[in-house]
Amino acid sequence: MSNELWGRKIEVIIRNKVLTYPELYIEFETNFDTEPIPDLGEVNIYNLSDNTLAEITLGDGIIVNAGYNDDIGSIFHGVISEIETTNEGVDTVTKIKMINVTQQYLNRYINFAYGAGANTKYLIRDMLDYAGGLKPNINNPTNNITYPRGFQATGKIKDVLTRVVEESGSRWLIHGSSISVIPKETGYTQGVYLDAKSGLMSVEKLEKQDGVSTHKIEMMLNHSIAPYSLLEVHAKNLDGIVMVVKGKHKSDFTTELEVRTL
């Protein structure tokens, strides 16, 4: 179906410049897994202006957000490791390779006084945005506390966020590029219900003799999916709870996963 029908959106943020789809044609593939090695990703952006191209350099911070309508979340935070611009027919294609450095964003310092009435969800969104345009994949604290006298945010952003999250009786999880705030009493990470009506496209049993993954899943893009996410899957050849081992988000708005049954 058309972009207008689905409301597909992509944001690529480089420094303070925001490049958006569908205004620009953008392709991406971002990878994630349970290994400690930083995740990698690639973005192709078509027909950038000469001025914009001149402003993009190696080592620049880059964030990729994707989703539908108002439900947009980060699928990659990192730095640019390679840039190449080529001509393909009448188009100019800028190919950008990225490496994940979410923790560097969260180690930035903040010194800001929020006014009376600020609440937990707003503080989380605003501080992640201040960190470099980050967005929470899940922002569902146990208690959305209102601070009637305001809130003083001073220190490393990750330390201030930890305080806000703990005061709300919640927990926050960072898996690669995914940042989620969830109720403390939920499982290791919030589960996602998945069947044909909610975005499941296919399930394939894997025959790996020495691997931890048992099944491969293809689904509509869901920016909240990350390593260790729990999925409640209902399909003909898989019915039950699985844990995400690795996967990728793609610009055809699919998420491909390898999972293991629990």
What does each model-found stretch correspond to?
Residues 1-55, 99-103, 187-262:
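Juxtamembrane "anchor/assembly" segments of surface/extracellular structural proteins
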Residues 1-2, 6, 93-103, 131, ...:
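Short beta-strand-centered interaction patches in the first periplasmic/extracellular domains
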Residues 48-132:
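Surface-exposed cap/loop segments at beta↔alpha junctions
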Residues 71-72, 86-90, 173, 225, ...:
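Short glycine/serine/proline-enriched coil/turn segments at secondary-structure junctions
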Residues 77, 121-125, 158-162, 214, ...:
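Extracytoplasmic/secreted envelope proteins and their assembly/folding machinery
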